């Protein structure tokens, strides 16, 4: 648990600092997640760890820090299935949205994380389109073109539904399971 929590906090720090600013709303989103999934003690520990990560990031420079991020992603990917990695990335997307907008540097950081976690880059576009309710967005959620056949639509739906099914991430805590349920519902609506 501790190594996962540390790796998770390293990734969260990467997203929070990606735009060059530490926003209160992003930190509060992280704290709420820690509180719900790990308890109040983890919030205090998380704040201390994040502060140390920010300090280390300043001292070591971008290239060295990105190597730590890569290593953390590889460690997480080695111990989690793809559905769990998707939910982790989904939470980091929520952190990036917490201040009301996603900076281009945050988007690049999220793309890096998706790649380093072994996820297809299209999953990010799908995550950003889940909350939209038009036909074009529905195709983007499913990762297919508007010219797709019915069979292609059905296959894409089955793939997404399987990846985001709440039962696949139940071991990661209630908050993650609820987020997966929300995504699963949005996929059904698409």
Specify the residue positions occupied by each region the protein language model found.
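Small-residue-enriched hydrophobic alpha-helices in membranes
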Residues: 1-17, 21-190
